[in-house]
Each structure stands twice: as C-alpha cells, then as structure tokens.
C-alpha cells in the first residue's frame, strides 16, 4: 500500500534508485496505490549518466509492495520491499531490464512488457 510521501526502490535500469511518491493517479481523492497502480513520483536518488536525473518528475507503476495483496483463490502475496518501475506516457518501461520478481496482477493490468522483462512472475 503506497501513499503520498512514500519512498520506493526502483526495480529497473532507468538510472533512478529511489522514488518519492507525489500523487496516486486514478480519482480525485484516492489515497493508496497497490500493485499495478500508477503513481507520479520524484527521483530522489539517481546514478550518473542515466536516462532519468535526480529531481525529475516521472510516472511509475508499482510492482512490489510489503503490504500483502489478497488473491481470488484466497492466497496472499507480499514482498520484502516497495518497488516501482519508471514508465513513459505510453505505459512502457523506460529501462530495458527489470530486477527481482513482480506480481502476477500486472498481467491483468496490461503491463505485458514489464511482465515479459521480469526474471520471475509470482
């Protein structure tokens, strides 16, 4: 569960290392974002000579949350960290690689490129 002012890790090679959530997209009074939701974030840490710079305002999709997510079969899944992937306005990832596992819920949200790049889908 991600809300405004949450610090997230970045799970791709776009160059950003930490993101700071500015806004959760989808509704005027929406407070929380879960797996597969899009947020607007500021880059708090970035590596030199990368596609995104420190201070850039980017869109990102949540791929892992520490808060458990219930599934239709009654099971739950949770991860060790809160992570996101930086995306462009066409909902495609800015980076070319995804690090770590991602949740199966991304497939239902039509983020096929992220699912195909991920080393493991849980």
Swiss-Prot record:
GO cellular component: cytosolic large ribosomal subunit
GO MF, any single term: structural constituent of ribosome
Disulfide partners: none
Biological process according to GO: translation
SMART domains: Ribosomal_L14 (SM01374)
InterPro entries reported for this sequence: Ribosomal_uL14 (IPR000218), Ribosomal_uL14_bac-type (IPR005745), Ribosomal_uL14_CS (IPR019972), Ribosomal_uL14_sf (IPR036853)
PROSITE patterns in the record: RIBOSOMAL_L14 (PS00049)
Entry keyword set: Ribonucleoprotein, Ribosomal protein, RNA-binding, rRNA-binding
Role of this protein: Binds to 23S rRNA. Forms part of two intersubunit bridges in the 70S ribosome.
PANTHER family, sorted: 50S/60S RIBOSOMAL PROTEIN L14/L23, LARGE RIBOSOMAL SUBUNIT PROTEIN UL14M
Complex and partners: Part of the 50S ribosomal subunit. Forms a cluster with proteins L3 and L19. In the 70S ribosome, L14 and L19 interact and together make contacts with the 16S rRNA in bridges B5 and B8.
Family: Belongs to the universal ribosomal protein uL14 family.
Name assigned to this protein: Large ribosomal subunit protein uL14
Organism encoding this protein: Geobacter metallireducens (strain ATCC 53774 / DSM 7210 / GS-15)
Gene that specifies this protein: rplN
